[in-house]
Amino acid sequence: MKLIIFLLLSLNAYSALHQEVELIYEDFNRSYLLYVPENITKKEKTDLVIGLHGYTGTASGFETQTTGGFSKSADRYGFIAIYPQGLHFNSSQNDASTYISSWNDLAGSKTNTSSGEICAVDADIYPQYPNCKNGGRCSWSSCNDDLGFVKRIIELTKNQYEIKNIYVLGMSNGGMMAQALACEYPNLFKGVVNVVGMQHKGLSCIPNEPVNFIIYGGAKDTTVPPVKIKSSDGYFYEP
């Protein structure tokens, strides 16, 4: 019983420290988790780090599954942490309900590129977002303006706190999104980290202005391979 009470208290403490912020963007209900270390004041200049979850992931999942609790790093190094939530829905494909969430990194919402289709003829087909129009058979991510959504989050945070530098990191589809943000708004970020999130063939981008940028790829990763080969589910990626 003592263990159960302790776990409940820990959960309540976690919920209290991470504020869920809700907003309407493009007529959709969107949200993100905001974590501000106790020693940071609104008048103090501080850094902002944005963490983006992967495909089918959650904002809270990114925090808890990254380095044993990413907000602990915010406490240790003194920065504000934000975990946006990708647009999500429940798919009933193959007679089973599946939670789907993703980011529109301007690649996964397409099928055709200047280099051909982003997936092979025998590729696995993933549930498509109800709001996506004419995405094609390879389309698997949200079609919403997620770049603008993240930028809006930054604007709202700047209205409340004195932000010095902004960093964004993402895992898998979140890494793809981080790279897209670097290409779209290179002057907005001090640093960008893409972890195992290669872009689809023909859609890889390079920022047109200098930005600190790191891509991590797994040499034996068959889901999102770091080299130009077909992935295990039949999709094509490139660094």
Cite the ranges covered by each PLM segment.
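Sec-dependent N-terminal signal peptides
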Residues: K2-N12
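N-terminal cap/lid subdomain of alpha/beta-hydrolase-fold enzymes
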Residues: D47-N90, A96-S109
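The feature captures the conserved acid-bearing segment of alpha/beta-hydrolase catalytic domains
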Residues: I40, G68, D75, K190-P239
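Alpha/beta-hydrolase active-site loop
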Residues: N104-Y161, A180
